Amino acid sequence: MYKLVLIRHGESTWNKENRFTGWVDVDLTEQGRNEAYQAGALLKEAGYTFDIAYTSVLKRAIRTLWHVQDKMDLMYLPVVHSWRLNERHYGALSGLNKAETAAKFGDDQVLVWRRSYDTPPPALEPTDERAPFSDPRYAKVPREQLPLTECLKDTVARVLPLWNESIAPAVRAGKQVLIAAHGNSLRALIKYLDGISDSDIVGLNIPNGVPLVYELDENLKPIQHYYLGDQDAIAKAQAAVAKQGKAG
């Protein structure tokens, strides 16, 4: 049996402000830093250790990983930073308040943009300052692979090559792997691992800063998965994530 640990970054400044973030590189709040430290404490207390970690190129995930490493005394851990683990690109919604957007376009439309599998939000113009083309962290990524908007289907398509070519081989080699990423890049991976249908994935909400453990068989198929921590608090956090895109 193999184990894989996933963690969504701690609360970011735009999570706190209920704004669509996507590829915008916002930082953690004080609460977010505390969530990351608590995640590290939970993992250490439960006896976990790691051989390698994967994260995105966005600081809210990177800093979450730093705090987990610090709390676990694993600052030496090899880390792979990949744009493929970035949050889903929210296109022209990037920076907008979710509740205000829902009040303008309706809860149903915003739910489709936030959680449906194959409907992306309106795209950015290529000349928009939020477009990733001139960002140095993507200098080695072919321009045609850089998005101006994404649906979850697009996010799955960019996450899976990293899983197939790097993460899965590391797990099969017996390495203890930690992935610190984002709500939708993790939803993309979980959809693949658990075989969740395109329609059912809309109901999957991942709380900030809570370790999610996957136990996998020899074929890397899930045996079971579970969150570490207070289960009632985790359920409330998941419900709060689900409410973010509603007007009321």
Curated annotation (Swiss-Prot):
Q: Which UniProt keywords apply?
A: Gluconeogenesis, Glycolysis, Isomerase
Q: In which pathway does it act?
A: Carbohydrate degradation; glycolysis; pyruvate from D-glyceraldehyde 3-phosphate: step 3/5
Give the residues annotated as active site: 9, 87
Please state what class of enzyme this protein is. isomerase
Keyword Manganese applies? no
Q: Name one GO molecular function term.
A: phosphoglycerate mutase activity
GO biological process, alphabetically ordered: gluconeogenesis; glycolytic process
- Listed CDD domains: HP_PGM_like
Reaction catalysed?
(2R)-2-phosphoglycerate = (2R)-3-phosphoglycerate
Task: Extract the HAMAP family matched here.
Answer: PGAM_GpmA
Role according to the record:
Catalyzes the interconversion of 2-phosphoglycerate and 3-phosphoglycerate.
Quaternary structure and partners? Homodimer.
Any idea what this protein is called?
Answer: 2,3-bisphosphoglycerate-dependent phosphoglycerate mutase
Q: Organism source for this protein?
A: Burkholderia vietnamiensis (strain G4 / LMG 22486)
